Design a protein with these regions (language model features):
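Surface-exposed, charge/polar-rich loops and edge strands
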Residues: 1-60, 68-266
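Phosphate-centric recognition/catalysis
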Residues: 65
Length: 266
C-alpha cells in the first residue's frame, strides 16, 4: 500500500520534511535566546532608571568605558557649561522623526575635568547643513545637572557612519576620547543625557526615557516556529494517507472496469 514512498518524488518530499523539522526547532531556540536577551536588557534599564542618583565621579572617570550595568544610571554633577567649545551631533531625530541635531556641551567640573552633556535636540536648518545652528544657552554660572549616563557611541552599536570632513563644530558620534583630544582636557568616559534642570522655553528638547524592547514578540516567533516544526510531520502523514486513498480508489476503479476481451454486462 505504501510502496509509493520509495518513489523519487516521495523520497525527496520526506527528506525535505526531515530537514525542515530541526531547522524550525533551531529557529525557535534562536528566537528564545533573543527573547531572553531583550528581557534581560529591559530589566537592566528598569533597574538603572529606578536607582537613586549618584555623583557622576562614582561611575566614570577619564578613559573609563561605561558598562551595561552603568548605562542609564542617573548621575549628578556640579560645575559650569562651556558653550565656547559646544558642538552639535548631526542626523539625530526627535519623537516625531524630524531630523536635527543633538547639542553636546562640555560641562567643566570643579577640578577642571570635563563631563560631556547632551542637552537635547534642536531642529536643523533645511537651507544650510554646514552653518553652525543657533543654540539656546544653558544656565550661566555654577549649576548642578542631572541626567542618564551613557557609553560612548560607536558605528557598530548605533549604525551611524563616522563621516570625515564635516563642517566646523559638527560631529557624527559622541566619543569622549576624541573630544578629550579636541578640548585638550581630561574628559570623563561616556556622556550624560541631561534631564535636569529643564531648559528655558523647552529648547533644546530633552530626550525621553529609553523605550522597552518588545521581548514578547520574540517569544511569539519562537512558539510559531515550534508549531511549524510540529506541523511538518502532521502534514506529511496527511499527504501520505491522501496519496494512499487516491491510489486505492484508482485501483478499485480499474478492477471494476471491463477488459477489452470481456463484453459489458447489459
Amino acid at each position: 500500500m505504501y510502496r509509493f514512498l520509495l518513489s523519487r518524488q516521495w523520497v525527496i518530499t520526506t527528506l525535505v520534511a526531515l530537514l525542515l523539522i530541526p531547522t524550525m526547532i533551531r529557529l525557535g531556540i534562536w528566537q528564545m535566546h533573543r527573547h531572553d536577551e531583550r528581557a534581560a536588557r529591559n530589566d537592566l534599564v528598569a533597574e538603572a532608571l529606578a536607582a537613586d542618583p549618584v555623583p557622576v565621579r562614582r561611575l566614570t572617570s577619564p578613559g573609563h568605558t561605561v558598562t551595561t550595568e552603568e548605562r542609564y544610571r542617573t548621575v549628578t554633577a556640579k560645575g559650569h557649561f562651556d558653550t565656547d567649545d559646544e558642538v552639535v551631533v548631526r542626523r539625530r531625530t526627535n519623537g516625531n522623526d524630524e531630523i536635527g541635531y543633538h547639542v553636546l556641551t562640555p560641562f567643566v567640573l570643579a577640578d577642571g575635568k570635563v563631563l560631556l552633556v547632551n542637552r537635547g535636540w534642536i531642529p536643523s536648518d533645511p537651507a544650510s547643513q554646514s552653518a553652525f545652528p543657533e543654540i539656546p544657552a544653558p544656565p550661566r554660572g555654577e549649576t548642578t545637572v542631572r541626567g542618564r549616563l551613557m557609553p560612548d557611541e560607536t558605528t557598530e552599536a548605533s549604525g551611524i557612519k563616522d563621516i570625515e570632513g564635516l563642517p566646523d563644530r559638527q560631529i557624527m558620534l559622541i566619543d569622549s576620547e576624541r573630544e578629550a583630544e579636541r578640548l585638550d582636557a581630561e574628559v570623563l568616559g561616556g556622556y550624560v543625557v541631561q534631564t535636569a534642570p529643564e531648559p528655558a522655553g523647552g529648547t533644546p528638547q530633552q530626550l525621553g526615557n529609553p523605550g522597552r524592547e518588545n521581548a514578547a514578540l520574540n517569544l511569539a516567533y519562537a512558539i510559531q516556529w515550534w508549531l511549524f516544526a510540529a506541523g511538518v510531520p502532521i502534514g506529511w502523514i496527511v499527504l501520505v494517507r491522501r496519496e494512499s486513498r487516491d491510489r486505492t480508489a484508482a485501483a478499485e476503479t480499474d478492477e471494476r472496469e471491463p477488459t477489452e476481451s470481456e463484453p459489458a454486462t447489459v
